[in-house]
Amino acid sequence: MIEINFDKMGGLIPAVIQDYENGEVLMVAFMDKKTLDLTLRDGKTWFFSRTRNKYWMKGEESGNTQDVMEVLTDCDADTVVIKVRQNGPAACHTGNRSCFYVKWEDGQWVEHSNPLFNPEEVYKK
């Protein structure tokens, strides 16, 4: 039986979040055993925030949750790809559909931002 290897990165694994319908990479976040278990159990994506040092469910503040459709691991069992149905317009906390909106062009990073919501309104604290 294959077991996910959480040992290589201090108990964390990268999780690539991909749109189930079109294959677009929406975001990359980190999971530990508990958040992977919650994701598999609940069918919603859960992550571990290295910055805030806490667990969080995608969309818990914005409402832009993700329904888990399929989960895969790589040949080393130390990374997962989670294919989701994105609820709400955007996966990125910046309001963009994907976190990957900065592109290398002509020797520099160029932002192709098209926010679908205003983060200042959504993440009031």
Swiss-Prot record:
Residues noted as binding Zn(2+) in the record, renumbered to the chain: C75, C92, C99
EC number: 3.5.4.19
Cellular localization per UniProt: Cytoplasm
Record's cofactor remark: Binds 1 Mg(2+) ion per subunit.
A Pfam family that the UniProt record links to this protein: PRA-CH
Cofactor(s) the protein requires to work: Mg(2+); Zn(2+)
One GO-annotated biological process of the protein: L-histidine biosynthetic process
Binding residue positions for Mg(2+): D74, D76, D78
Reactions that this protein is recorded to catalyse: 1-(5-phospho-beta-D-ribosyl)-5'-AMP + H2O = 1-(5-phospho-beta-D-ribosyl)-5-[(5-phospho-beta-D-ribosylamino)methylideneamino]imidazole-4-carboxamide
Keywords on record: Amino-acid biosynthesis, Cytoplasm, Histidine biosynthesis, Hydrolase, Magnesium, Metal-binding, Zinc
GO cellular component entries: cytoplasm
MF (Gene Ontology): magnesium ion binding; phosphoribosyl-AMP cyclohydrolase activity; zinc ion binding
InterPro entries, alphabetized: PRA-CH (IPR026660), PRib_AMP_CycHydrolase_dom (IPR002496), PRib_AMP_CycHydrolase_sf (IPR038019)
Keyword Magnesium: yes
Pathway assignment: Amino-acid biosynthesis; L-histidine biosynthesis; L-histidine from 5-phospho-alpha-D-ribose 1-diphosphate: step 3/9
Keyword Zinc on entry: yes
UniProt record similarity statement: Belongs to the PRA-CH family.
General function of this protein: Catalyzes the hydrolysis of the adenine ring of phosphoribosyl-AMP.
Subunit annotation: Homodimer.
Protein name: Phosphoribosyl-AMP cyclohydrolase
UniProt gene name: hisI
